[in-house]
């Protein structure tokens, strides 16, 4: 099982060119989608038509990471901009195969932290919980956690689940706070999760059951 930002993990920060973040169009989505389906596990994928519908509502965006020196799209991210909370939800982030492990993932994330200049609160990130069994998978999972923590993200002390077609998948929920923002109060975190479930996961029939389970555990 991979988390929704698996392929952004860097094994070491190398000298890479700066990148430019460009908002993608529906035409870009068509080009990215084949790569997207290869990057993430089937139970974590969104269908093409659903992503297209989300993007048409303007708050859900496809962002392309372009290296202007080599004229390549080196990665991409899908983000959701909150209605009231001045922050974003990082739904997916991936770096192209040939550029993984070179530093582009960290560079892309740092660009996202500057997505808004004024009043930006931070970024929510879903991260896979490490499995108990020692081995390659667990080490990769721990490395992803170190990646985000090194960039300043903090794990929220809540039992979060990602709604999938089959059930709710337990995940860690991290939050990267802007330098002038403390960790968000519980009420704002719950509001953010509720908004994401209603907007991003509108295609999941039992999303409300997963959400109610979250509220029950947090009363």
Regions found by a protein language model. Name each.
Residues 140, 154, 161-210, 214-219:
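C-terminal "cap" of GNAT-fold acetyltransferases
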Residues 7-50, 195-202:
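Short amphipathic alpha-helix that is part of the acyltransferase structural core
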Residues 93-100, 129-130:
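A short, internal acetyl-CoA/4′-phosphopantetheine-binding micro-motif in the GNAT/acyltransferase core
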Residues 129-157:
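Conserved active-site alpha-helix within GNAT-family acetyltransferase domains
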Residues 101-116:
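Conserved acetyl-CoA-binding loop-helix of GNAT-fold acetyltransferases
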Residues 41-69, 73-94:
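A conserved beta-strand-loop-helix scaffold within acyl/acetyltransferase catalytic domains
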Residues 116-136:
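Conserved GNAT acetyl-CoA-binding A-motif
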């Amino acid at each position: 099982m991979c988390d929704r930002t698996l392929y952004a993990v860097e094994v070491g920060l190398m000298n890479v060119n700066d990148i430019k973040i460009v908002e993608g169009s529906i035409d870009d989505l068509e080009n990215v989608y084949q790569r997207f389906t290869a990057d993430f596990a089937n139970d974590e994928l969104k269908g093409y038509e659903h992503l297209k519908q989300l993007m048409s509502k303007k708050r859900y965006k496809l962002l392309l990471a372009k290296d202007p020196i080599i004229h390549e799209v080196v990665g991409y991210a899908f983000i959701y901009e909150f209605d009231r909370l001045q922050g974003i939800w990082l739904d997916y982030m991936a770096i192209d195969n040939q550029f993984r492990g070179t530093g582009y993932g960290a560079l892309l994330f740092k660009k996202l932290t500057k997505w808004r200049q004024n009043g930006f609160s931070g970024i929510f990130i879903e991260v896979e919980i490490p499995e108990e069994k020692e081995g390659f998978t667990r080490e990769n999972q721990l490395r992803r956690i170190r990646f985000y923590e090194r960039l300043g993200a903090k794990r929220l002390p809540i039992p979060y689940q990602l709604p999938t077609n089959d059930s709710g998948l337990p995940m860690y929920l991290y939050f990267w706070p802007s330098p002038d923002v403390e960790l968000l109060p519980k009420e704002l975190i719950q509001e953010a999760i509720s908004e994401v479930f209603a907007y991003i996961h509108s295609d999941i029939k039992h999303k409300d059951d997963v959400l109610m389970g979250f509220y029950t555990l947090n009363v």
